[in-house]
Amino acid sequence: MRLAYWIYEGTAHHGIGRIANSLKGVHAVFHAPLGDDYVNVIHTMLERTPNFPRATTSVVTGRDLAQGTNRLPDTLRQVEERFKPELIIVSASCSTTLLQENLQLIVGNANIDTEVFIYEVNPFRVQETEAAEGLFTALVKKYAEKQDLTEEPSINIIGPASLGFHVRSDVTSLRRMMATLGVKINVVAPYSAGLADLKKLPAAWLNVVPYQELGHGAAEHLEEKFGMSSMYDTPLGIQPTMKWLNELIEKLNAIGAKNGKSSNLKMPPLTAFSFDGMSAPSGVPWFTHSADMESFSMKRAFVFGDATRTVAMVKFLRDELGMEICGAGTYLHKHAAWVREQLAGYLPDDLIVTEEFQEIAKRIEADMPDLVCGTQMERHSCRKVDVPCMVTSAPTHIENHLLGYYPMLGFDGADVIADRVYTTSKLGLEKHLIDFFGDAGLEYEEEQQEKVAEPALATAGETAGQATEAATAPATPGAPLTGEPVWAADGEAMLKKIPFFVRKKAKLNTETFAKENGYATITAEVVRLTKESLGGG
């Protein structure tokens, strides 16, 4: 039944499609029924490139199964003739895996000249992230060859992939910083790399692996087989970026000295990293001390997403913006231990590890934080409870695959994130001001469904006069209620004076107080008593 709801990770063959669509000269062929051809649709809708997805579905139908025929050989011949790829990756979807067919034998019947790589994975145990990591690691093992080191300091950027969260802008940000340092980019993989690029991966001095989800297996293989060094930190935020740059310079100089290469890299003035070469590379340090951002200090934030962004956003929000983290979690069970280790001392309670978006929605509704950083699922959940939310992790929707330059990494990324935090929360403050002072003629959407409860409908069989009398009479406690209390007009009016971003929680607290203390009707006095019971003035 889980597939009837939103899921955080795609299927295994979706992950395979992401790798195939990232690599030049590579084409994926999925042995799958018609319903499993959604990979092409997802890439066509979300990937902002002029190219069609590098994937084809070899459709399996009920008639084919009944007649004992197989379309895969014909599909392979068509793909070779039309796309002329250097490599074809063949994989079965979760549905056709149940047929337990010998793909090697079927592929052999195609008699094509193009090299075919069959990637078999158990789709019932492996999902998108693990499948993508496994395939990319396998391809690096297959194609990487011994190379002489480049004469000048160089790095590989390993991990960016098709449909990754802001990866195109992240790569641009990393390229800008490397150009400032005078460091060459040897290969970016898998995003935009070809098979020839995979072969020359060992020519770089250092591997940079900014994402926890993709690239670790490939980097570890390059370390074991070719003795390469790697950096696995994520330069998200000012402090992590500074630390990352200094470590990068230190490692490259050490590798150069070890291999007899000329390398005397030094940290340039920070202004060199800015767009104009004269100003600070990021406005975050001074902006956090401005009057506007001071109001964010100790605001409560909740973070959920993949491993990389959950860790990085928690640290950025607390360490650089001064926000209080009221909770965090990830949907990647295999990376949960790493996330816990990285966030030791940052969280008020245990890390949430779940693939059920309903659990996160309930937690958000219970905590009512000032800001949520999550996936598109959290964006939908927050909209229902009127909590400000910014999307900082996959899964995403089309509005998170932008044409402009919106990195998450580096100095540029710090500015983008700070802007998003500010505008996301600032709009919430604006709505509160409109609620408080009036809309001045603005057509601001009001929650029309939250009408003031009519006293006449308070309880079954109660007359309008009795209900009105109950609404205006002084609040008197009684035995705990078994039913739900009724809101009087003055109680509703007082509730609307409470800022919208804590209004729902205040309403729940008031109703709980009323039931526990026997108030059948919630008047303004009951709202005040609730506030006093919770320590409010």
Curated annotation (Swiss-Prot):
The active site is at D292. One of its GO terms (biological process) is photosynthesis, dark reaction. It holds the Pfam family Oxidored_nitro. The keyword Coiled coil does not apply. It catalyses: chlorophyllide a + oxidized 2[4Fe-4S]-[ferredoxin] + 2 ADP + 2 phosphate = protochlorophyllide a + reduced 2[4Fe-4S]-[ferredoxin] + 2 ATP + 2 H2O. Its cofactor is [4Fe-4S] cluster. Keywords: 4Fe-4S, ATP-binding, Bacteriochlorophyll biosynthesis, Chlorophyll biosynthesis, Iron, Iron-sulfur, Metal-binding, Nucleotide-binding, Oxidoreductase, Photosynthesis. InterPro entries: ChlB/BchB/BchZ, LI-POR_suB-like_C, Nase/OxRdtase_comp1, P-CP_red_C, Protochl_reductB, Protochlorophyllide_Rdtase. Residues 459-483 are annotated as: Disordered. Pathway: Porphyrin-containing compound metabolism; bacteriochlorophyll biosynthesis (light-independent). One of its GO terms (molecular function) is metal ion binding. The keyword Oxidoreductase applies. Binds 1 [4Fe-4S] cluster per heterodimer. The cluster is bound at the heterodimer interface by residues from both subunits. Protochlorophyllide reductase is composed of three subunits; BchL, BchN and BchB. Forms a heterotetramer of two BchB and two BchN subunits. PANTHER family: LIGHT-INDEPENDENT PROTOCHLOROPHYLLIDE REDUCTASE SUBUNIT B. Belongs to the ChlB/BchB/BchZ family. This is Light-independent protochlorophyllide reductase subunit B.
